Every structure is written in C-alpha cells, then in structure tokens.
Amino acid sequence: MQPKIRVRGQYIKDLSFENPNAPKVFLMMSKTPPEINISVNVSSAALPVKPPEGEQASVALYEVALQINIESVVEKLPAFICEIKYCGVFSIEEDEELEQEQVKRALLINAPSILFPFVREVIAKVTSSAGFPPLMLEVIDFSAMYEKQLAENADGEK
C-alpha cells in the first residue's frame, strides 16, 4: 500500500549566493570552463498537528528539506557558491496498514522529486541573475540516493 502524500506548501527556507571574484572570473570563464561541484541532501521532520477537538488526527504533516550546495571553480578560483534549502510541507494520511518504511520512502524519495523542478528553476534564475549562464541541474534519482544511503548505513552497522 502506497502512502497518500499531498503538498500543503513549499518555500525557500534559506538561499545564499556568493560571487566573490566578479568581474575577473567572467574573463577567465571565456578561456576555461568552470568545474562545478554539487552536493545534495534530503531530510524530513514531523510537524505537530492539532486535530479538531474530540477527533483523532488522521493526517500527519512533515517538512521535507532539499538542500543543494553548488561550488563553481575556474582555475582554482571560486567563481560562485550557491546554497539553497528548499522545503515543502507534505501531509500523509495515516493508515494502520501503512508501514514506517513506506512513509520514510515517500518523504525521502517522492517528496524531493516533487520539489526538485522548483529548486532547479530557482538555481537557474539565480545563476543567470549573477551574470553566469543559467545552471540547469541534471535530474536527480532520489530513489538511488535513498538506496545508497541505506546501503552505507547497513555497512556502518556491521
């Protein structure tokens, strides 16, 4: 049984862009393409839900955070540094048959997959506004990321 997940809201929680070596770096980029390093992290946290008086909560709320850090370097000189934490509030209908692992997968795979196109657009606009070509991130396989993290955790427990 798949959890019923709904987006209740989404927002930029934190955004930082540094362009420390402009305009020098623009001249350097015309000769040398930048090296771009990207790190991605996904986390989730339960949010308190107050059901109407006399009723039990049948919906659980979670905040899912998609953190992307990007560093662009040209000839060992930082071109730009971009850090964004893009969040969404998601609801999951509680069901007795729903296993915790299914909820975890929905929050760490499905939810960031929903958020990703929006954060990708923000990054493209910010890099463009800073004078760089718009950075279009490749699609991220959140399922593979999740499975890799599970495998690393299992190896760490041995």
From Swiss-Prot:
Can you name a GO cellular component term?
A: cytoplasm
Family the entry assigns: Belongs to the SecB family.
GO BP of this protein: protein folding; protein tetramerization; protein transport
Query: What name goes with this protein?
Result: Protein-export protein SecB
Q: Which GO terms describe its molecular function?
A: unfolded protein binding
Q: Say if the entry is tagged with keyword Endoplasmic reticulum.
A: no
Q: What domain of life does the native source organism fall in?
A: Bacteria
Stored Gene3D superfamilies: SecB-like (3.10.420.10)
Origin organism is Anaplasma phagocytophilum (strain HZ)
Q: Which PANTHER family match?
A: PROTEIN-EXPORT PROTEIN SECB (PTHR36918:SF1), PTHR36918
Main localisation: cytoplasm
